[in-house]
Amino acid sequence: MSDSKSSIIDSHCHIVFSNFNEDREKVAERWRSQGVKALLHACVEPSEIPAIKSMADQFQELRYSVGVHPLDAHHWGPETLSVLKNAALDDSRVVAIGELGLDLFKAENLSEQLSILMPQLNLAFELKLPVIVHCRDAAKEMLEVFTKLSEHGCCPKGVMHCWSGNVKEMKEFLDLGFYISFSGNVTFKNAIDIHECAKKVPQSRFLVETDSPFL
């Protein structure tokens, strides 16, 4: 039996966040020693992009997305879509659009969140890039959006990040072609629905993430 470690991909992290300013190099040493071969940094708002790009220069394992998080909808402006598009076209290390989505757990501004979600989904479809989806207490609303886009043949594929839904919801997203990514919440003792999802998701659609520094 081989002694080599399996390759691990962290499908969602925020390594540029200030939480890592004191020990980022040591964190990199740890992920390398644990067999992490690639990391995907999820952008949450446009002002992050230069720092993420610089971080990708420093750490060759890093790839990244560009996008606006639903809880950062207030950062959206007239030029935002152009900024995201240009950033995606200018760097081949941009491999996704996001972190986009809906969050009705921490906010109730559904119409504002939808107003920045749709342009990003359209951009992803135009550029043929997958999306990184943040969906918290909003599975019904998110499924409605994706189902309508799918009916019109313009629904991008992607990953449901930090999955926290139930099996029924998961199957609906799987039917739309999405991957399911599990984070530290799958270890929570009372996260029964997430445990069941982790058991039932097809291996070919199963991703893992740290969502660092959060989980």
Model region roles, listed by residue range:
Residues 1-215:
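Mid-domain alpha/beta scaffold segments of enzyme catalytic cores
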